[in-house]
UniProtKB/Swiss-Prot annotation:
Belongs to the UPF0246 family. One of its GO terms (cellular component) is cytosol. This is UPF0246 protein RHOS4_29700. HAMAP family: UPF0246. It comes from Cereibacter sphaeroides (strain ATCC 17023 / DSM 158 / JCM 6121 / CCUG 31486 / LMG 2827 / NBRC 12203 / NCIMB 8253 / ATH 2.4.1.). InterPro entries: YaaA. One of its GO terms (biological process) is response to hydroperoxide.
Length: 257
């Protein structure tokens, strides 16, 4: 079983992660593609970044500086799970994983990225902001989806071949998972859905659902899950499996609001 997560917009101010002696940070396998994208992004102005990603002027200026220094600042790279600091990563809580869970996560948890394509948790990355839905024109097309094409799906296929994984658990957002070309992907996909019930209405509450996606990835890693049916035992954040709302491809987890 593989699991995929979205990255986080919010980055840790002081990223830190204690690793066991036999587990070292790794390098992104699609680093050459990230370098190519960074060269394109380096030519963008703060106004361009504001328009493309709808971000503030200070954040745009910060990322202009980051892309300008991207190829000279590799020493600033840190493990992805230490740098990402959003709700999903609050649910994952990589800093509190034991050594065995971290080792398993390094092999089986994948992080989708607009800049790096596909990451392992301990892959060293640099601070950046480049969302997958960004309409950044490259020689491959008008968007990052065009740039990545089937490369992310093929990288997932390669990970599955290396690990023997037979299914992919999609804990990413629609924006990011769209980058995994389903026509090229050789794995069946299971997409857990996290709903909140309040006043008789069931809906996705973004804050809790993002945390639950991270917690689901942690649950998979800690228990070294391979059988999709074992996902049903997930209990975190008040969520519990709801069989009446679920299908094999879309297990639903419900919490009271």
């Amino acid at each position: 079983m593989l699991a995929v997560l979205s990255p986080a917009k919010r980055l840790a101010a002081q990223p830190a992660l204690d690793l066991p002696a036999d587990l070292a940070p790794s390098e992104p396998r699609l680093q050459d593609q990230a370098d190519a994208l960074a060269r394109v992004a380096r030519d963008l102005t703060a106004a361009d970044l504001r328009r493309l990603m709808h971000i503030s002027e200070p954040l745009a200026r910060l990322n202009v500086a980051r892309f300008a220094e991207f190829h000279e600042a590799r020493n600033a790279a840190v493990p992805a799970v230490a740098l990402f600091d959003g709700d999903t990563y609050a649910g994952l809580e990589a800093r509190t994983m034991d050594a065995d869970a971290l080792r398993w996560a390094q092999e089986r948890i994948c992080i989708l990225s607009g800049l790096y394509g596909l990451l392992r948790p301990l892959d060293r990355i640099q601070p950046h902001r480049l969302e997958m839905g960004t309409r950044l024109a490259t020689e491959r097309g008008a968007t990052l989806y065009d740039f990545w094409g089937d490369r992310i799906a093929e990288a997932l296929n390669a990970r599955a071949a290396e690990t023997g994984a037979r299914v992919l658990v999609n804990c990413a957002s629609v924006e990011y998972f769209t980058a995994a070309d389903r026509a090229a992907l050789k794995l069946p996909v299971i997409t857990p859905t996290f709903l909140e019930e309040r006043n008789g209405e069931r809906k996705i509450v973004s804050f809790w659902a993002k945390r639950a996606r991270g917690a689901m990835a942690r649950f998979i890693a800690e228990n070294r899950l391979d059988d999709p049916e074992d996902l049903r035992a997930f209990r975190a954040g008040g969520y519990a499996y709801e069989p009446d709302l679920s299908t094999d491809e879309r297990p639903v987890f419900l919490r009271a609001g």
